[in-house]
Amino acid sequence: MTLFSSITSISKTNTSSKSSVNSLSGSSLSMGSNSVACGGCDKPAAGAAILANIDIKAKVDLSLSAAAAASAKCGACH
């Protein structure tokens, strides 16, 4: 059984695209066409955040360190 309830992806030529991943606990990650994954502020547990990053890495080939650095820069929690 997977942690994520849905993966939604919208992609069109000559327009911006955005992908998002929602977990069963309500937390989510989103990624624009010109950015790396940006996590939301409602992190129920550190373990859930780590699992989310691992799942994103498997699907779009992001490194965990790049995702962690990006979440600090995205401004979602500020």
Curated annotation (Swiss-Prot):
Which intervals of the chain are annotated as region Disordered?
A: 1-32
What's one Pfam family here?
Coiled
Which top-rank group of organisms is this from?
A: Eukaryota
Q: Which InterPro entries match?
A: HssA/B-like_chaperone (IPR050533), HssA/B-related (IPR008455)
Q: Where are the bilayer-spanning segments?
A: none
A GO BP entry is: sorocarp development
Report the family membership: Belongs to the hssA/B family.
Record protein name field: HssA/B-like protein 30
Q: Which organism is it from?
A: Dictyostelium discoideum (Social amoeba)
